[in-house]
């Protein structure tokens, strides 16, 4: 297929190179080199390496951005010490421009260069194509261009007959349409075809002929899932994604592996619609540039990334405190902004004990799509610093902290572990060590950050229950139901309840909130039969049931996690056990559809 830009690309390359030389002419010069000479086909992985000459002494950091020629640049990785980037164009062919900016962090000297790179179609004639990727359970399906006003999706069928459809993509008659196929069993034969939705009455869906392909073998060492109680035959959300503290794994509800993630992330925080994932990556404790949040695609390739050191540059410019690391939460918000949790460390004197005490709090950070910090909220500004962690947790004793640097031990004061946006545009923040859920005035980015209410023992709500200890404690993954913003779902680890009453099981809770009168009424208080001392998740499923993950269970067989489906009466309908602890688990319709 002829490239729609024709010879323009060669002219643009000359102009681009000339511009780059002008930008870098002052002294420091950056050179960008690809691992493969262009052109390459859609989906081919290219490793870009930056070299710098003429720089004064000092550490050099690099920022990578890319764009399809004629469009705006999209951030891939913000400034960091990494001078290489694995990149591909997986959507369509064309001329792409890779940009790198280099800066000397000591002298502030900068250099910038760009490289024009041609990606060609995988289509020969008018026939679709199916090709493997670097991941044995991910394939690239390429379809010929389709007409304006139409859209396309791909359907693939497993050996036993299960069908999966990708999300639709909008057609552009200039370009082929390409899809990552994910959610595939290893060593299995599949059939696949694409479907064009023309939007015309009577002939809307037009399928292509089938292609056949066979998946690869598993090569990674993965954790396993074992069925404890089998689910019913007809059940919603048939994919289980387990966020291990290591390689994440997706299985069916029988434990059959259908995907696994990269090894360069510490844990997944959220799957995103369309088949991408957000994760936290914990690096060297003494290097904030290695403390990262990363969005990656089906093959594990980085789509978007920043790090604590780069964010601290922005926070300093705004007069905010520094962060030490990201933890527990990063997710895309409605409207495309990105929210993350990070640790803040301060020495407080005669506040949480006699003399100077190192105290760890949290910061909520909101980024725009280009990773610019646009809003922050700091527990040291808005919460009572004299209210210590409910069970007196310190970092050395509990060993659950991100890196800290100001003392040999620190009070793990808040230990935030989830953040979600409410229907009216505020934030719901979970503080494990305060045993509170806190509603923050975010107001879709226009809020001043004041605390609207605190839900939990000794907070702002009464609990309408006769239970001997109705309140959740050390809770995880609190979120409001999408269909009913007055119903709150959470996983109640129950640490404080267990410390107060003796041995207790963790619970899956659904609470009806009357925010006007500050009353919480239990709708579901399910005893899950195990005690999870940490970790956990909570989710409402499409069929109206709930999924709870007891992520940190200690027993004679070693650490494990239990993912359970529970009905509205608290009955456990199905249960599957992982042979490792899981930070969170997600019941998904498929790997493109989180719920």
Labelled PLM ranges:
Residues 121-140, 145-156, 178, 185, ...:
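Histidine-/acidic-rich catalytic cores in large beta-rich domains
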Residues 38-44, 129-133:
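Short, solvent-exposed loop/linker segments at the N-terminal edge
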Residues 75-82, 168-174:
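Short beta-strand segments within Ig-like beta-sandwich modules, predominantly Fibronectin type-III
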Residues 88-95, 181-189:
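Surface-exposed, short loops/turns at beta-strand junctions within beta-sandwich domains
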Residues 49-55, 142-146:
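Acidic, Ser/Thr
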Residues 56-62:
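Solvent-exposed loop segments of extracellular immunoglobulin-like
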Residues 62-68, 154-158:
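Conserved aromatic beta-strand anchor motif in extracellular beta-sandwich/beta-rich domains
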